[in-house]
Amino acid sequence: MIYFLVDRASAFTMRDFVELHAPGLANLVEIVHYEDLLQRQPLHTGTYIFSALDHLTPGGMRVVRELIDQLREPAAESRVLNDPARVLLRYELLDTLHRRGLNRHGVARALDSRSPLRFPVFVREESEHTGAISPLLHDHAELRRALGKSVLRGYRLRDLLIVEYCETAEPNGRYRRYSAFVVSGRVIARELMVGDEWMLKSHGNAPTESEIRDELEYVRGNTHAAQLEPIFSLAGIDYGRIDYALVDGRIETWEINTNPTIRRGRQADPIPIPPEINTLRDPMRAHFTSALEAALRSVDTGLPPRPLAVRFSAECLRNATPMIHVSKPTWLRHVASAIRPALPRLYRLIDVVSPYVTRASRQLRS
């Protein structure tokens, strides 16, 4: 049995994949919500995939680590994928790749924006997968304004990263974003997105017929697997999806998501690809689905599950709530909503206010 651990709000990733695209896994994969973990006794032996690690609070991470310690005991006869003791999350991964010369672009936390930066840069959330929340910023003044605007929109500076921009456009001006999964060391090419925007998300994917043929060749050939394996290993990630580009033939890693969308779920594409073009992607989707299903089956222990009594320390239980990190607290969302009508006027004050906001946030942090 495979237990896929995830927060309740993010469980659609594996749930939709199994229900809509891989029903043969329904009796093998069980979704377990982090929020229910302490009340779920006994647990059972099997393979545990810990996803969405960036959504866990320190208390939630402590619960996971104490659980993993018990799963690793020989008598537990269980496997663990994505041990947080080894996993590098977004900031740590990008910083490590840059320092080792494996990524051209660097990263800094917003509360440490005095770090040397190579402009242009953009701002994004550290623990969410929403892409850039700012345009490209070309100097410190623009960066200060962007951070100030982010605070007024309900973001906390401690949750934000400043990421250096890396130009990856093709000679024709188009951008390519490659994606590949890993399951216990097995790399599986997922898709190739092509569009006209540098921050390429699914709504900007607009491939031509020729580019779809390139995508099919990429997925079937798994052409970058040898280059991706050491990156996944460095990141300590056994299950997840890497998003990356190629710069002069080298991998430029954008992120590795430990709870990625696997295939399109119940929601329609925000900007659908024309049907006559989209149909050409069906062989790619079928190939990927078959490969991922086989990879998931391969990590099952093959042993019948049996009850496993798990105990957590008193200190762990005291600090376990909340389990899940909230990027925008309710009170902050309410404040941002209340001041939204005044934002145009407030933005004009950003040049004056933002340095003080940033400085105050750093002082509160220290």
Which role does the model predict for each range below?
Residues 58-71, 91, 143-148, 276-285:
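Well-ordered, non-membrane alpha-helical segments in soluble/globular domains
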Residues 237, 246-366:
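C-terminal active-site "lid" helix and adjoining low-complexity regulatory extension at the edge
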Residues 1-3:
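Extreme N-terminal starter segment of soluble prokaryotic enzymes
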Residues 121, 161, 188, 240, ...:
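Protein kinase-like catalytic core scaffold
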Residues 115-133, 154-171:
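ATP-grasp fold ATP-binding core
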Residues 141-221, 225-231:
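Phosphate-binding site of ATP-dependent enzymes
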